[in-house]
């Protein structure tokens, strides 16, 4: 539950900051503060923070700080693109190297044949590259308000759809002792 809150909390803070706190600068500030609080709580309670959370928070702190200092919202808008490309590269390289990173993230939930982890790595890489392109299209062609709404109400459903589309692969290739 804490991990879910640490992922969703900053997004909710960003949305609330934008629509109720006076725009993208305040939204960025609220998201930065919430992210630092969430990652700190994760560390205090779980005594660990995932590498992806560290990467995500670091990119957020850099892009968010530049946004606040410069007053230019472009930097916070390219943060998702940067993260999606980084994650896409991580999953692509782990597939190429036959050491699927996604296996370590999901192995406690589902156990799969090794070749299925590789396939899932490539699919996840493609998803992240696709999301990078979509983010670029939205922030470059639409208003701040549209981008914020997309960030909150578009990315989550798209991600959910991607996950659902992976279920046939997971169910077909799961090992007998898998939890799903």
Swiss-Prot record:
Taxonomic classification: Bacteria, Pseudomonadati, Pseudomonadota, Alphaproteobacteria, Rickettsiales
Membrane topology type: Multi-pass membrane protein
Transmembrane segments: 25-45, 49-69, 76-96, 118-138, 150-170
Protein name (record): Inner membrane-spanning protein YciB
Assigned keywords, A-Z: Cell inner membrane, Cell membrane, Membrane, Transmembrane, Transmembrane helix
Principal subcellular localisation of the protein: membrane
One annotated Gene Ontology cellular component of this protein: plasma membrane
Species name: Rickettsia akari (strain Hartford)
HAMAP family in the record: YciB
């Amino acid at each position: 539950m804490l991990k879910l809150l640490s992922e969703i909390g900053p997004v909710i803070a960003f949305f609330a900051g934008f629509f109720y706190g006076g725009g993208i600068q305040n939204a960025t500030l609220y998201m930065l503060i919430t992210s630092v609080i969430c990652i700190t709580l994760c560390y205090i309670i779980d005594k660990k923070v995932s590498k992806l959370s560290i990467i995500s928070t670091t990119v957020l702190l850099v892009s968010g700080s530049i946004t606040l200092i410069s007053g230019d919202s472009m930097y916070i808008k390219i943060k998702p693109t940067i993260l999606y490309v980084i994650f896409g590269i991580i999953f692509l390289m782990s597939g190429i190297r036959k050491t699927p990173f996604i296996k370590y993230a999901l192995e406690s939930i589902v156990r799969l044949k090794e070749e299925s982890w590789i396939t899932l790595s490539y699919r996840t890489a493609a998803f992240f590259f696709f999301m990078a392109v979509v983010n670029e299209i939205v922030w470059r062609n639409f208003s701040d308000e549209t981008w914020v709404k997309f960030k909150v109400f578009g990315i989550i459903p798209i991600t959910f759809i991607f996950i659902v589309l992976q279920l046939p692969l997971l169910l077909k290739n799961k090992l007998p002792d898998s939890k799903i």
